[in-house]
Amino acid sequence: DEAILANLKADMIKSRADAKLNQSRCFGALRTYVFYGPDFIRRTTLTNPALEAMSSEILLAKIGELMGKQHEVLYYGPQSEKEVTEALAMHHKTSAELQPLDKKHLQLLPTDESKVLMAQYDAKQLYYLQYANLGKQFDVAADPEITLYNEYFGGGMNSVVFQEMREARGLAYTAQASIMQPNYADTKYGYMAFIATQNDKMQMAIEAFDEIINNMPESETAFKIAKEGLISRLRTDRTVKEQVLWSFIGLRNLGLEEDRDKQIFEKVQAMTLADVKAAQEKWVKNRKYVYGILGDIQDLDLNYLKTLGPIRTVSQEEIFGY
């Protein structure tokens, strides 16, 4: 139906234009650019002219090709395995020989050198992130220390980052930081820290942020809250219904067969603030970062930002891909 396709294109073009006016959407696009780079955006995003040129014939052909490629069928529901198998045999028609998929997992960009990527957004508040590729592939044995570090340092309103940057120093509207876990066995850990602050507080906020990231404040009271909160959540969390399927696939992607929370729950019981400090020194301290800043560039102190690394300005078209 060409009329429906034309309306779909118009809706998508408008949605894309609206996204460029939204600060959070702009920051999300910048973050993706910082993590994965321009090649990933070009491979996964149609430009507006390419979108406009898309025809019903092309789309239907692409959908038809899917049934000739290797795939899995997930089912959660009341039917028995026999009933589901019979329904698939009747309705799920595939090619006799399925083409294998070229499985290339999305990789974080390296952060061998510090640099600053800036994107323009007209506002009195800026969004700031610093990102590091930690260079290590998944290791399930690291789950307890990483999980407890994230809970203590950057996990929520009681975390060290939030309390220091917003409550104690008044330098950010919000703040968070965490070690990012791989989704596949061959992908690497990353580190991402984020603050939203006023343009005129940028330098003070970044310097304070860097100080607490590299020289983590130690509070037994905050640690107790974090540890108890984590244990309580693990004790009550349940994997139910269709979550069981996604949990199985997530574990399989990491080469695991046993639920990760079991080990975390058992190991965290005996962990101390010293263990969190050791994790911070092992995973976080003195890393090189790529910095991403979304804000009104003419209102920011570029001389200060140059001390973080060479600056490059990226356009909306670059970060969104259209």
Label the model's feature ranges:
Residues D1-P100, T174-Y322:
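Charge-rich, well-structured scaffold segments of protease-associated domains
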Residues N22, D139-V140, I146-T147, M165-A168, ...:
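Short, structured coil/loop segments at alpha-helix boundaries
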Residues P38, L60, K103-Q107, E151-Y152, ...:
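Intrinsically disordered, low-complexity segments enriched in polar/charged residues with Gly/Pro
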Residues P100-V160, F194, F320-Y322:
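His/Glu-based metal-binding/catalytic segments typifying zinc-dependent metallopeptidases
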Residues L129-L134, G154-A196:
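A structural supersecondary motif
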